Structures are given as structure tokens and as C-alpha cells.
Amino acid sequence: MFNKRIKKALVTGITGQDGAYLADFLIRKGYKVFGLYRRTSSPNMWRLLNLGIRDKIELIPGDMTDMASISNAIIKSKPDEIYNLAAQSFVGTSFEQPLVTAHVDGIGTVMFLEAIKQINREIRFYQASTSELYGNGKVDRSVNESYLDEHSLFWPVSPYAASKLYSFHLVRIYREAYKIFAVNGILFNHESPLRGLEFVTRKITNDLARIKLGLQKNMQLGNLAAKRDWGYAPEYVEAMWLMLQQPTPEDFVVATGEKHTVREFMELSCEILGLRSKEIFVQNKRFLRPLELNCLTGDASKAKKTLNWKPRVKFKELVEIMCKADLGRWQNHLKGKIFPWDAINDPSAY
């Protein structure tokens, strides 16, 4: 009998939340996984170590703004699939560093598409798009809070979203002009214990865990009225993979279809941890965005019908998972345990 050929995948942004979960998912599927990561003096591997997969991945140092670097990664890994998850993905930072954001989130995507066109057009390409594309879209709505799908109007309100919109259209153009199997995954917010501390959900659960243990007195946040459609990240990376297994390339929205406010996330977290939000919350204008989105709620009907994908972890369970993870980390830290983690900069943990 012939041995089944092992599929290979190249994942950019592999040290991030989505990259780590996707790598873990692909490894479980039997893939050989290559990861492109930034050339830095101390690459942050805590997520890969946390999942126990660091030694199962072949890492390739590279630069998302350098064509030669990207081409080299493709030639070296010879992938069947490429998942482009690398991004400057923090909206606030995109206002402070718009040029960096444009180069990484926009030009980097074009370089990958061009490299695929030149090296091997059989490679399947996934582009991590975002619900931020919709912004406060100027759509014809009977009410302000409508569900957004693949046909809704894009109206970005940040340099991050604008850069992602550029990438979105280039994926479509290369798909149509060069018949490359390239797709956009328009993912709404998705969280987990591996979310970065700069994101509000993880900031809430980490701060509240510290408050619960007497390590800090209050929690500072910005706009509590902001509404989002929050899902569970490990489920969303499965949707990414499913998109590249289809007979034809199409774009998909991935979302829960439920909206919740930052206040709801905060108050539920407090309830889970036995805290009172009124006693610990302090509003800080520093955490307000120059332009805030009103409400983003996704319609993933197409993904459900075509990919047979649907979210399983509900909002309350998601918050519980994150709260318990951060509380457990801080409890273990206080016991003197050393482990890969982002809240403590301890080189010995790596």
C-alpha cells in the first residue's frame, strides 16, 4: 500500500492567538506545519508552548513586507495551503502606526498572492479578513443594528480596517484574474485564553483575576457601551480550514449572530469571579477609540449551509473559560510555578 501523502501548511502569524490554535488544529489533522514569524531577538512563543506544539512546528524567520522573504518561505515549505494570519491587528495601534499597519496588513497580502502566482498557482490561500471592514456601514437599514453578511457594504473606520479591505479586494482580484484558490474569511471577534492582553476581553479577565487575588485595586476601561459579536477562537480556526477544503473558492462570514456589550462581558466576568463591578470599574479616556463602532453582528448562514459550520461555545461559556484560565494562571504564579504566559515577562518560562 502507498502511504498517504502528508499535506503541508504554511501559517503566518503563528505565534498569535489564531495562528497557535490553527497550528494545533492542523497538526491534529495530520499536517506538517510551517510557521512564518518575525525576525526578532526574542520571538514570543508562549502560545505554542502553552498548547504543547512548539517542537511540532518548523519555524521560518521572515518579513511580511519583504517579497524575497515570503518567496523563500513558500519555496522552503512547499505548502498545499497558506493561511495568512499575520497582521498588526490592534485597532488603536493602527491610528498610531498607520504606515506599519498598511505595509503588514495590506502590502504583505499582495506579496503572498504574487509569490503564489509566480511559484505555484495550485497553492490554496486563506486571507484573514475582519468584521472591522463593515465599520459603521452606510447601509439601508430599518434599524441601526442589523446582521452583516458577505453582501453587506464595507465602510472601514480605522487604518487597520482600511488595510484589510485592500487585502480583501486583492484576494478577489487574484482569484478572478489568475484562477488562484484564494478566499477571505470575514471573522467577527473571537476570543480565548490565548487572546492578547491589549484586547478588551482579555484585559477584563486578567485584571479581574488580579483584583480577586488582591494584586490590584481597580480596572480601567473605555467605552462599555460598545457591542460586539464574540465567538470562541478554536472554533473559528476550524472554519478557516473548511474554507480551503471546498471545491470552489468563496468568501465567508464567521460569527455567532449574537451581540453583547463590553459592560455585559465585564459584569458577567465579575459574577463568575464573585466581584462587584461598581466597586472596581474606573473609566479611562485613554482606552477610547478615535472612531468607535456602533454594533457589529454577523450572519454566518452561508458558512452553516456550505461549510456545515456553526458556533458551539456560547457567550457565557466563553467568558467562564477565559475567567477561569486567568484566575488559574495567577494562582499558579503566586504558588511559584513557572509556565509560558504573557502576563509575566519571565524568560525562564520559555
Label each residue range with its predicted role.
Residues 101, 194, 259:
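Aromatic/pi-system hotspot detector in well-structured domains
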